[in-house]
Amino acid sequence: MGNNFSSIPSLPRGNPSRAPRGHPQNLKDSIGGPFPVTSHRCHHKQKHCPAVLPSGGLPATPLLFHPHTKGSQILMDLSHKAVKRQASFCNAITFSNRPVLIYEQVRLKITKKQCCWSGALRLGFTSKDPSRIHPDSLPKYACPDLVSQSGFWAKALPEEFANEGNIIAFWVDKKGRVFHRINDSAVMLFFSGVRTADPLWALVDVYGLTRGVQLLDSELVLPDCLRPRSFTALRRPSLRREADDARLSVSLCDLNVPGADGDEAAPAAGCPIPQNSLNSQHSRALPAQLDGDLRFHALRAGAHVRILDEQTVARVEHGRDERALVFTSRPVRVAETIFVKVTRSGGARPGALSFGVTTCDPGTLRPADLPFSPEALVDRKEFWAVCRVPGPLHSGDILGLVVNADGELHLSHNGAAAGMQLCVDASQPLWMLFGLHGTITQIRILGSTILAERGIPSLPCSPASTPTSPSALGSRLSDPLLSTCSSGPLGSSAGGTAPNSPVSLPESPVTPGLGQWSDECTICYEHAVDTVIYTCGHMCLCYACGLRLKKALHACCPICRRPIKDIIKTYRSS
């Protein structure tokens, strides 16, 4: 046989020394392929010779990706060695250009990772010739859609193995068992039940957080070297039967299994959400393309706060430490939507997340400069605006935050608009900050995107954000401060600000007849707001508290921190 690859398929069919099979060989299914083998009913060795070449022998044709049969989102380079998913999280099934041999390692290098999705590569084999498969007939997912058809076997690679730069090798042995190896680690049993009587093509689904892969030169594994210790330990009853139970284990690959870094944890109550469904939900909350240059700053407050995964993940190692504050590595841009995902929640109870912006460059601060509570940041001399996400948060939730040209910070929660949360001065550089509270112990920056104002469906402006009357204008300036931000324990002390330049003075709510007179003073929380601070024009104090604050040393506005030159009492017209 030598290296003549064309003789490989004839090996299992042309061996006269083997006994005939107990089932017909000429039956075809609706796709034109053979029916699944029922060899699991017989507990003896398979009665065929798998296509195994002598040691060191590989086909002359290199192993490449099939140039035509691929998912609609796949982009392939001219060498047919590298593929990339251009958008979404699915429609990225690929095949090898030729059948692989028994014990031939299919070696892949992960070249691109996109952390906003759940799940990773799906790897396996098929006995169907990809040249006879129309690309339009390929389903979105290898698991469970493709593996539910005869002649396809695949399983999900655990997420902790799907890091950029990792080299994954997988192969099938003569007993239909599939093994994999990550880099130079030990050989692990992946799944079993592959029918080796027919030629097998490699199947690679560039799914979920795996965005791009590259095929490396294949190698043969010597059978004598395949004695992984983990095989005996991992051989569960569900792996003893080779056909039906393999189907079951492959279908279960669609379940959401938490990774080592705690990402994509399933909800605490009820059944785990399948990754396909979870990603479909996320795709409604995320744009097709995300920029990945935004990271967390190295500065963090809290002895147990860690910045991980190329500075995209902030984790609190011990939930008892409430001093958990992190910043973005650069100022956010106007109209740039920042997407953040809650990737770990420490219990069934919902947690809380503070967010805000500051004009203070984190690079000029030390951890000791930061207060114990994020809401106490407003006592610093720089501009800080902080509040908490309204409503409960759970693992898997995605938040979108954007500061528009008017200085309004809008929030979306899983694609649903939550309205304007803060008013800030968009003319200055603004770093975003996050504070983790309670059971929220890990967040991840998924990326960012700049969309046109009318092109942000997940972040529509609330009615209060486009005021046309003095009453509406007063609502815009006071709602984020006194209503929305009061969802946190000290939220009212961490309000937002309108632009504090002189040109913003005409927009200050100084007109009688405002609709928010029932709002409480941010100092005493007893009397209604009835005082305008000069020169910034903010209304957040009662007259008595305003007088006391004005007499204080270095008196400044609680919102924008500008010096207080005077206070003006206002009266409501009857």
From Swiss-Prot:
Interacts with CPEB3 (via N-terminal domain); the interaction increases CPEB3 ubiquitination. Interacts with DLL1. Plays a role in hippocampal-dependent synaptic plasticity, learning and memory. Involved in the formation of spines and functional synaptic contacts by modulating the translational activity of the cytoplasmic polyadenylation element-binding protein CPEB3. Promotes ubiquitination of CPEB3, and hence induces CPEB3-dependent mRNA translation activation of glutamate receptor GRIA1 and GRIA2. Can function as an E3 ubiquitin-protein ligase to activate monoubiquitination of JAG1 (in vitro), thereby regulating the Notch pathway. It is found in: Cytoplasm, Perinuclear region; Cell membrane; Perikaryon; Cell projection, Dendrite. This is E3 ubiquitin-protein ligase NEURL1. Residues 1-41, 491-511 are annotated as: Disordered. A lipid is attached at residue 2 (N-myristoyl glycine). The keyword Coiled coil does not apply. Its main location: cytoplasm. It holds the Pfam family Neuralized. It catalyses: S-ubiquitinyl-[E2 ubiquitin-conjugating enzyme]-L-cysteine + [acceptor protein]-L-lysine = [E2 ubiquitin-conjugating enzyme]-L-cysteine + N(6)-ubiquitinyl-[acceptor protein]-L-lysine.
